[in-house]
């Protein structure tokens, strides 16, 4: 099943993937340079670069696990009932306050493109849909 994603977020994702690829290449250079300094056991620069590379690879893999995508235009978002792309206001009776959430997908959550994102796959997201 395709992961729903807003067109703007898809563009941001493509940009982020390019940025991560660039960082990965730069980190590979850092690793080679640090390795050329000798003993890797006590080479902090080498270990820091390897850790950075691991982070970049994990982030890339996390973003890729959500493909394929179903790109959604803002004009396609339904507003007559709660669903993907909606901004939802929920009143907390205990705290006596209203919080606003955006019901979006995991990529919007991962890229932190919106404040207060709830993914439509999450239990909370599923509870408020419809």
Regions found by a protein language model. Name each.
Residues 30, 65-66, 117-118:
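Short, charged/polar low-complexity linear motifs in solvent-exposed/disordered segments
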Residues 22, 48, 57-58, 63, ...:
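General N-terminal targeting signals
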Residues 23, 34, 63-70, 127:
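Conserved, well-folded catalytic cores of nucleic-acid-processing
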Residues 11-12, 25-26, 66-69, 79-83, ...:
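A short linear-motif detector with a strong N-terminal bias
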Residues 1-58:
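N-terminal cationic and glycine-rich segments that engage phosphates or anionic surfaces
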Residues 44-76, 80:
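Internal alpha/beta loop-helix hairpins
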Residues 74-130:
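Non-DNA-binding regulatory cores of transcription-related proteins
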């Amino acid at each position: 099943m395709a992961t729903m994603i807003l067109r703007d977020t898809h563009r941001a994702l493509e940009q982020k993937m390019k940025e991560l690829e660039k960082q990965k290449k730069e980190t590979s250079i850092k690793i080679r340079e640090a390795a050329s300094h000798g003993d890797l056991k006590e080479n902090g620069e080498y270990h820091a670069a390897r850790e950075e590379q691991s982070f970049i690879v994990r982030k890339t893999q996390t973003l890729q696990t959500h493909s394929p995508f179903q790109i959604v235009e803002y004009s396609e978002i339904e507003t007559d009932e709660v669903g993907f792309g909606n901004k939802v206001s929920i009143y907390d009776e205990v705290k006596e306050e209203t919080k606003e959430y955006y019901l979006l997908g995991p990529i919007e959550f991962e890229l932190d493109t919106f404040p207060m994102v709830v993914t439509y796959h999450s239990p909370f997201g599923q509870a408020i849909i419809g």
